[in-house]
């Protein structure tokens, strides 16, 4: 049976590229680049998005290396593949082109906060609707590849939800750990890709490697290796290493320490004031509840905010730019580690 996403149509044992057209405004179409790989043997469907945020580059780089490589398109590879892969290479093309932080410049909205979207909404809502209905629907597992944004550093982590269905939740943990990140963060986030994928019947997995607008080969390779790890866990077979993985060499997977809670901290300063953010911690730092995490200062050094840790936790991401506005994220903590012990 053929597998199709947009104009990409792949017969069994073939790979196809094409475009998913979304009418993001009357008379305006956004063209999302897509890849479809249809294995020669029946099996599960893996759906993947990358580039939900325009300045997060490791995910798109990983998919381009992994799915567009000569080995990925080799007839022997495709004939042995069980199931299919459908993927977007730049889910928010306008944000990618603009090097935009957090939001889609077409409407100023965060594409990962408007799911499941609307066919008649704003540009981001229409893209979300297209992804939900045409890519997520029918998938067994959904991966959303991210990095820290242009202004963020992070410690590699995976995010999954727990539903209360013991068998399904155990499966989500196994798939999440197959990615090979340092942390496995448990939590639900309404309006996001992975939450919507869960509602549509797929196990949704958020994968975060790299950040700060960089395209570090190690983190690109770890994203690619994570996709292959999930494919192996799904029983799709041994997909060939990407060129970037071969270039980087052997990778050491993270421990995937489970974190059962999280806390985000945001700037709380006057809306008309430009803040100057001076963090006192780094990504991967383990902090105690009540510990000072930094200061947001005014231009002349007056202290506007002294955020402290609301929980014992590890810094999973951190805004690294000096400029800070009211309501902007400062950092996030993951807490309640598995077994109560930090690695």
Predicted regions and their residues:
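Structured catalytic-domain cores with a bias toward divalent-metal coordination
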Residues: 1-343
């Amino acid at each position: 049976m053929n597998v199709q996403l947009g104009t990409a149509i792949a017969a069994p044992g073939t790979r196809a590229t094409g475009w998913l057209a979304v009418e993001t405004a009357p008379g305006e179409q956004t063209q999302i680049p897509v890849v479809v790989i249809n294995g020669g043997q029946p099996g599960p469907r893996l759906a993947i998005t990358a580039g939900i945020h325009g300045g997060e580059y490791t995910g798109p780089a990983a998919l381009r290396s992994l799915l567009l490589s000569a080995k990925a398109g080799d007839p022997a590879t495709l004939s042995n593949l069980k199931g299919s892969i459908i993927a977007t290479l730049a889910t928010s093309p306008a944000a990618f082109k603009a090097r935009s932080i957090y939001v889609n410049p077409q409407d100023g909205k965060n594409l990962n906060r408007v799911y499941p979207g609307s066919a008649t909404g704003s540009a981001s809502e229409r893209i979300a609707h297209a992804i939900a209905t045409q890519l997520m629907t029918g998938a067994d597992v959904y991966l959303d590849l991210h990095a820290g944004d242009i202004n963020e550093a992070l410690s590699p982590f995976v995010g999954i939800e727990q539903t209360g269905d013991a068998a399904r939740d155990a499966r989500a943990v196994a798939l999440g750990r197959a990615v090979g990140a340092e942390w496995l963060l448990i939590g639900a986030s309404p309006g996001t890709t992975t939450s919507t994928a869960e509602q549509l019947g797929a196990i949704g997995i958020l994968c975060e490697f790299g950040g700060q607008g960089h395209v570090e080969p190690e983190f690109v390779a770890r994203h690619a290796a994570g996709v292959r790890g999930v494919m192996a866990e799904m029983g799709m077979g041994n997909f060939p290493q990407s060129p970037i993985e071969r270039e980087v060499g052997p990778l050491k997977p993270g421990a995937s320490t489970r974190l059962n809670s999280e806390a985000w901290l945001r700037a709380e300063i006057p809306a008309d004031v430009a803040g100057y953010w001076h963090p006192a911690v780094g990504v991967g730092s383990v902090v105690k509840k009540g510990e000072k995490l930094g200061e947001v200062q005014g231009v002349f050094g007056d202290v506007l905010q002294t955020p402290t840790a609301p929980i014992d936790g590890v810094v999973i991401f951190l805004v690294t730019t000096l400029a800070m506005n009211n309501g902007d994220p400062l950092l996030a903590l993951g807490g309640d580690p598995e077994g109560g012990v930090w690695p």
